[in-house]
Amino acid sequence: MAIGTFAQLKTAAANWLDRSDLTDRIPEFITLAEARFNRNLRIRDMETVSTAISTTAGTREYSLPTGFVQMKEFHLSTDPITPLSYITPEMMSRLWAGSAKSKPQVFTIIADNVRLGPNPDATYTTSMLYYKTFTALSDSATTNDMLTNNPDV
């Protein structure tokens, strides 16, 4: 049986369970599996690129994209490209606590935000390669990259 949709996955799970008393719980089992995949996997299907962050002079903190899990690479789209190095939040506070402005050199992640150091002195376009969560399967979102490319996991 090919498994390519949420309905087909639920049917396959029901076949494997071979128990009718758990059929109504199958969507819950799928949700729990998706949470585990998002927590433990870092595979190519989870990679995405965002150029949504454009800095503003003097503003150092920006919201991370929805579904962000982990940064893989982050740079300013300058000529030549300016790679941004990760430092811990503690190091960011020690090195770039003031209001000095210059071209950012480093970044850290605090909660759902990325913080740049030093404060940007101008507008810069960024490019972020990061791992994102898989789209959660449901009756309205019947497939995602995990199910399409890895239905056997």
Write out the residue ranges for each language-model feature.
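Glycine-enriched, solvent-exposed interface loops adjoining structured elements
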Residues: M1-V153
